Amino acid sequence: MARPNVTVIIDDQSFVIPGTESGGLHRAGFISDNALIPNLGTTAERNSGIMTIGSMGDWYGRLSSLDPIQSGLSAGYGGNHSSYGGTGARWPGGPTGAWEGEWWTVHNYLQYGGVAVVGSTGEEESTVGALDALSNKQVALDSVVAMSSARTGLTLGGVLVGAKYYSVVGDIANVNTVVNARLDCIGVYPHKEGETLNDSWTDAAASTSITPNEYAIAVYGAKRFLGTSNDADNDVKELNCAPDVAGCLARTDRESEYWFSPAGFKRGDILDSMRLVYNPTDAEQDEMYAQKINPVVTFPGEGTVLFGDKTLAAATSTLSRINVSRLFIYLKKIVGSAARSLLFEMNDEDTRNAFVNSIEPLLERIKGRRGVYDYKVVCDESNNPGSIVDVNQFVADVFIKPTKSINFIRITFTNVNTSVDLG
């Protein structure tokens, strides 16, 4: 028998959280088909089917903190519910299991300082599926991002070095369903589904699961990055840049305005990228952009950026640009809210004037913040004749000249003789 002794064990279940941006209010929705909420949610979140994550610290904390099981209160971080692997189970080496790719999708968005809203699909005590939960406009959303739910090994030079995550048809179709049910947020998609999506540029067409309209952004690009800092393998991860582009929207909302373009070197910088899986050539970028697909591009010495701001709307419309589309989404939310206050009021000149007086200052502020070139509000007897009033209707017409983003720059250098007067 061994002599009496004391054994001291140090069990490291901490995480070194990567550097992130912070302070944003942009709310991005994510649809989980692989039990993210049953594994990482509080009891209250499992009951509601909605999990809200406000920071990267919260997201990592859900991997390492004990599950309160039945309290569902402030201590409600990670750990499996008892039916999913035992009370207080943890994942000190990083996410594992069927929900691994979904965890990394949300992770890559949270780096940009936004708020993630995850909806489950009929898991645990929740009786409401994610599609219904996130389609409900009472859950405020600014964007919805396609999950990368599928996983395969990442092999470089014949050696297994990590994991590759990618979207399948269902991931894209889920986002399309929610976005087109709401019509008040932007859907951010990898341009197609599949494991070899971004290995090389072979097909410019967007997924047939995406409805082509001003509420959809298709993104070409996948990045490689390192796993969690205390993962013994610290292996390489590969995931498409759709969550990063949603992060660029969050950055734009925080640092500029809703109606600014999220692309380019000021607001479109892609974080935590070791390298892109494939960096498209100039000719390939031209082909993508002609088909309304926004490439993520690495410029040597300058960084990796979102290098396009098109939606999938018809090219003949100014709504084919992200900033214009988001301007009208913003107006729809704000003006729609103001208009609801008029319901059941008296349908007369005083009410019409009150509406105009409430809307014009808002539009003037947007104009001062570079969102519109000009505007006009018409709400009088010209569009509210007796025939409209008699059927209890109220009509307002708001004409907007939205500010456009710069997509093409032309600079001409002219060589002139010394004798030419340049004054």
Model segments located where?
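Structured, hydrophobic secondary-structure cores that serve as assembly/anchoring elements
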Residues: M1-V118, V139-G423
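A short, well-structured beta->alpha microelement
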Residues: V118-N136
